[in-house]
C-alpha cells in the first residue's frame, strides 16, 4: 500500500473530525428518513447529510439529475473495487466514502426536484448491488489467503440475500421491516476497515479486512434469515385470510 493512500486517509479523517465539530455545534434538524436509524449509524448518517448539503445545492444549481449522480456514485464504487483488487485498500476506502456521498445526494435531488419515480429507484437499487459485487470481488482478489477470500465471497452472498429477501417480499406485496445488518451498516463497517487497514503493520491489515468480511457474513446472514422468516409469516397470514382458517376467499 502506498504512502499516498495513508496521506489521503489522514486528510479525510481530519476533514471528518473538523466537520464533525461543526455539526455538533450547529445541531441541524435531521432528515425525516434518517430518524429510523439509531446508534452510531444514525449519528454518521445525520452527519453525512449535513456535510453533503453544500454538494446538494451545487448539484441542483448545475441541474444534475438524480440518475446522473447515481451513475457517478456507481462508477466511483466500481473504482473502489478496482483499488481494493490491487491491494490499495486506503484508496478504496476513500473512494467508498465519496461513492456513499453520491448515494445520499441522489435521493435528495430527486425529492428536491420532484423527480422521484420507480425507474430511478430501480436503477439505484441495481447499481447498489453492482457496487457491492465490485467491492467484495476486489477484496476477494486481494486478500492473501484462501480463507480470507472465502469470507469475502460469503459476505457478498449474504449481502445479496438480504437485498433479495426484501425485493422478493415487496414483489409479493409484503413490506419488509428495517432491522439487522442492512446496507448502511455493511458499507460503514467496510469503509472503516479499509481506511484503517493501511496503518496496521504486517499482515494485520489483511486480518482486519478478513474480520470485517466475517462480521458482515454473520450479520447479513442473520438479517437475511430474519427477513425470510418475517416475510414468510406475513405471506402465510395473508393466505389464511382474516379468519385464519384458510386462503382468502376460500369456502
Roles of regions detected by a PLM:
Residues 68, 94-97, 101, 118, ...:
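Residue-level recognition of specific faces of alpha-helices
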Residues 74, 83, 90-108:
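Alpha-helical membrane segments and adjacent membrane-interface helices in multi-pass membrane proteins
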Residues 101-109, 122, 126-130, 161, ...:
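Active-site His/Glu-centered metal-binding helix of metallohydrolases
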Amino acid at each position: 500500500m502506498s504512502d499516498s493512500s495513508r496521506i489521503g486517509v489522514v486528510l479525510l479523517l481530519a476533514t471528518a473530525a473538523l466537520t464533525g465539530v461543526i455539526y455538533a455545534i450547529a445541531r441541524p434538524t435531521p432528515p425525516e428518513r434518517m430518524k429510523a436509524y439509531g446508534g452510531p449509524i444514525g449519528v454518521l448518517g445525520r452527519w453525512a447529510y449535513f456535510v453533503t448539503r453544500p454538494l446538494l445545492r451545487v448539484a441542483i444549481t448545475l441541474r444534475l439529475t438524480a440518475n446522473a449522480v447515481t451513475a457517478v456514485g456507481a462508477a466511483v464504487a466500481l473504482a473502489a473495487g478496482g483499488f481494493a483488487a490491487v491491494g490499495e485498500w486506503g484508496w478504496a476506502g476513500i473512494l467508498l466514502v465519496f461513492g456513499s456521498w453520491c448515494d445520499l445526494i441522489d435521493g435528495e435531488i430527486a425529492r428536491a426536484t420532484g423527480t422521484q419515480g420507480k425507474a430511478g429507484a430501480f436503477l439505484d437499487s441495481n447499481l447498489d448491488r453492482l457496487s457491492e459485487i465490485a467491492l467484495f470481488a476486489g477484496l476477494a482478489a486481494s486478500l492473501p489467503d484462501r480463507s480470507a477470500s472465502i469470507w469475502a465471497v460469503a459476505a457478498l452472498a449474504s449481502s445479496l440475500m438480504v437485498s433479495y429477501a426484501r425485493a422478493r417480499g415487496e414483489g409479493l406485496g409484503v413490506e419488509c421491516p428495517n432491522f439487522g445488518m442492512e446496507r448502511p451498516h455493511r458499507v460503514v463497517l467496510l469503509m472503516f476497515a479499509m481506511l484503517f487497514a493501511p496503518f496496521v503493520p504486517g499482515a494485520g491489515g489483511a486480518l482486519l479486512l478478513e474480520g470485517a468480511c466475517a462480521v458482515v457474513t454473520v450479520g447479513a446472514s442473520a438479517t437475511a434469515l430474519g427477513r425470510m422468516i418475517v416475510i414468510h409469516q406475513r405471506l402465510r397470514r395473508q393466505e389464511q385470510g382474516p379468519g385464519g382458517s384458510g386462503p382468502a376467499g376460500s369456502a
